[in-house]
């Protein structure tokens, strides 16, 4: 399959997702986009790399329509529509926020949402898409899986990871970007442009069918190695420090690293819960009230707080 055409010009006035990152993911779903209306509702209108990518590759993807909103917190924003021939600009009544009535009205007409929503609003953004039964392909922090609703959607197969998972991505930014600091390793310049590197970025989607990994086989066992698998202090599950150490002979609950979801196969393991803060995300074992009463933390093992853990259980095959 040949490469998509590149959008040649882009004003560097937003937190830009790079064209390469968009292309490398979209190429896996090319058939899904035929005769569809695409809505980019969290970007900078026609200046967005998302809008430019789909405009440039409109015919190759056989799109029906492309719509993008700009966002202006201080005044009226704009709506941009591309039908394959020309871009039409329309002034909005509001600021272009994805949760505004104007944006939701367009969302109802769209088939697929492709964008990079604000990370701090990721859960409410996905809630909105699920509520309106929309297909989507969006960027987010890998850690968002630990959020209550996101984990539930993951568990119930309403969303899954795309083909790019837990990657350190570079985003182009303005040199006057609020957090820009050329002295830190997170920022760098190339060909006169400024970029920021952000770790743990994944694509989230409900396009097509989830592509699951082969069954995991670690060659590790709980029997005769019990000391390597202590129990959580406040949660009835064993603690597993690394994915490669998941015991193949353990049929009970176990807490594994969040990155386990990168190699998750629902035919082999069941997602039970997530320990991402002092309390269990879904409170599957109904332990949260007791933990709160005693000022505990479900992540603790031998009194020491551990990192986020996904609670899983082997499927009975």
From Swiss-Prot:
Pfam families: EcoRI_methylase. One of its GO terms (biological process) is methylation. Signal peptide: none annotated. One of its GO terms (molecular function) is site-specific DNA-methyltransferase (adenine-specific) activity. The keyword Metal-binding does not apply. It catalyses: a 2'-deoxyadenosine in DNA + S-adenosyl-L-methionine = an N(6)-methyl-2'-deoxyadenosine in DNA + S-adenosyl-L-homocysteine + H(+). InterPro entries: DNA_methylase_N6_adenine_CS, EcoRI-like_methylase. Belongs to the N(4)/N(6)-methyltransferase family. This is Type II methyltransferase M.MgeORF184P. It comes from Mycoplasma genitalium (strain ATCC 33530 / DSM 19775 / NCTC 10195 / G37). The lineage of its organism: Bacteria, Bacillati, Mycoplasmatota, Mycoplasmoidales, Mycoplasmoidaceae.
């Amino acid at each position: 399959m040949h490469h998509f055409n590149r959008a040649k010009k882009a004003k560097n006035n937003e937190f830009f997702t790079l064209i390469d990152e968009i292309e490398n993911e979209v190429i896996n779903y090319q058939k899904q986009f035929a005769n569809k209306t695409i809505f980019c509702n969290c970007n900078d209108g026609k200046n967005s790399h998302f809008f430019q990518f789909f405009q440039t590759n409109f015919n190759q993807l056989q799109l029906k329509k492309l719509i993008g909103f700009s966002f202006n917190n201080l005044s009226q924003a704009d709506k941009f529509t591309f039908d394959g021939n020309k871009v039409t600009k329309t002034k909005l009544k509001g600021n272009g926020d994805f949760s505004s009535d104007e944006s939701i009205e367009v969302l109802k007409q769209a088939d697929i949402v492709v964008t990079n929503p604000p990370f701090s609003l990721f859960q409410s953004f996905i809630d909105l898409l699920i509520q309106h039964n929309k297909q989507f392909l969006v960027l987010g922090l890998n850690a968002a899986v630990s959020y209550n609703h996101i984990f539930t959607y993951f568990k119930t197969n309403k969303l899954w990871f795309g083909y790019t998972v837990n990657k350190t991505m570079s985003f182009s930014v303005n040199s006057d970007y609020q957090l820009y600091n050329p002295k830190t390793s997170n920022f760098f310049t190339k060909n006169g442009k400024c970029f920021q590197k952000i770790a743990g970025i994944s694509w989230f989607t409900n396009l097509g069918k989830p592509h699951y990994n082969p069954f995991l086989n670690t060659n590790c066992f709980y029997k005769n190695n019990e000391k390597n698998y202590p129990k959580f202090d406040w949660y009835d599950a064993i603690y597993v420090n690394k994915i490669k150490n998941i015991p193949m002979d353990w049929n009970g609950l176990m807490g594994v690293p969040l990155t386990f979801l990168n190699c998750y196969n629902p035919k082999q393991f069941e997602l039970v819960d997530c320990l991402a803060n002092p309390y269990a995300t879904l409170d599957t074992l109904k332990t949260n009230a007791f933990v709160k009463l005693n000022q505990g933390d479900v992540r603790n093992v031998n009194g020491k707080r551990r990192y986020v853990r996904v609670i899983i259980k082997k499927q009975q095959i």
